[in-house]
C-alpha cells in the first residue's frame, strides 16, 4: 500500500507583475556561471522590506490576496551559507518584526518552478514513532477491509511555481503610510530563499532555496 500526500496552495499576488514586462535576463549561479531566465519586473511597488546588515541580506515580503504572504531573502553575493547557518525561528521573527512599508523603484524576480518528492517511510515517520504500519504486523482492516495490507511507501510531493499573477505551490488590507522613500532597487538575479507563510497563524507553509530557476 502506497500513501501519497499532495498539498495544494494557490495564491494570487495583491500586486501582480505584468506579463508584458517579463524579459530574458541573466541569473548568476555563482561568480563565474550564469543562466538565462525569464525575469519578471515591476516598478514603484510599495511593500514591506528590511535590510539586514548583520547577515548581509535583503528581506522582502510580497502579499497574496487572502491571508498568505511570501518572504523573499536575497543574500549578498557569497553570503548564502552565512544566512542559512543563521536561520532560526528567532531570525524569521526578527525580520518579520522589522519589515517597514517601502517603495521599491525597480523589483526584478525570476519566474521559477521547482518540484521535489520525499519518501517519509524510512526516516521521518519512524523517528516520530510511526513504525508498525510499515511492517507485516500492521492492521489496516478498519480502513481497507483486509488484514493483509501494510504501508510500503509514503510519498510527499511539493511543487512551487512563481509567476506574474501569483504562486502555485503544492505541498491587513493595505498600507496607509510609506516610511521609506529613498530610491531602492531589488534584483533577484542570484540565489535566494522564499518562505510562504500563513499570516493568521504565522505557520510556514513552504520553504525553498532557489539556486537555479532555469
Curated annotation (Swiss-Prot):
Highest rank taxon of the organism: Eukaryota
GO CC entries: extracellular space
Marked site positions, Reactive bond: 180-181
Gene Ontology BP annotations: response to cytokine
Cross-referenced Pfam families: Serpin
InterPro entries: Serpin_CS, Serpin_dom, Serpin_fam, Serpin_sf, Serpin_sf_1, Serpin_sf_2
Keyword annotations: Protease inhibitor, Serine protease inhibitor
SUPFAM superfamilies: Serpins
Molecular function terms from GO: serine-type endopeptidase inhibitor activity
PANTHER family: SERINE PROTEASE INHIBITOR A3A-RELATED, SERINE PROTEASE INHIBITOR, SERPIN
Family: Belongs to the serpin family.
Protein known as: Serine protease inhibitor 2.1
Lineage: Eukaryota, Metazoa, Chordata, Craniata, Vertebrata
Amino acid at each position: 500500500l502506497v500513501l501519497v500526500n499532495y498539498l495544494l496552495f494557490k495564491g494570487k499576488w495583491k500586486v501582480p507583475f505584468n506579463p508584458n514586462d517579463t524579459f530574458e535576463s541573466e541569473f548568476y549561479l555563482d561568480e563565474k556561471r550564469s543562466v538565462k531566465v525569464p525575469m519578471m519586473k515591476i516598478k514603484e511597488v510599495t511593500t514591506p522590506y528590511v535590510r539586514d546588515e548583520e547577515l548581509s541580506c535583503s528581506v522582502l515580503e510580497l502579499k497574496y490576496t487572502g491571508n498568505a504572504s511570501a518572504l523573499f531573502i536575497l543574500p549578498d553575493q557569497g553570503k548564502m551559507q552565512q544566512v542559512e547557518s543563521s536561520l532560526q525561528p528567532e531570525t524569521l521573527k526578527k525580520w518579520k518584526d522589522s519589515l517597514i512599508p517601502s517603495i521599491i523603484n525597480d523589483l526584478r524576480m525570476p519566474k521559477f518552478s521547482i518540484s521535489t518528492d520525499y519518501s517519509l517511510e524510512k526516516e521521518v515517520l519512524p523517528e516520530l514513532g510511526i513504525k508498525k504500519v510499515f511492517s507485516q504486523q500492521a492492521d489496516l482492516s478498519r480502513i481497507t477491509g483486509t488484514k493483509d495490507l501494510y504501508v510500503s511507501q509514503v510519498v510527499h510531493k511539493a511543487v512551487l511555481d512563481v509567476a506574474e499573477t501569483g504562486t502555485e505551490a503544492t505541498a491587513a488590507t493595505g498600507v496607509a503610510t510609506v516610511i521609506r522613500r529613498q530610491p531602492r532597487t531589488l534584483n533577484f538575479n542570484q540565489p535566494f530563499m522564499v518562505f510562504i507563510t500563513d499570516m493568521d497563524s504565522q505557520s510556514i507553509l513552504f520553504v525553498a532555496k532557489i539556486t537555479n530557476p532555469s
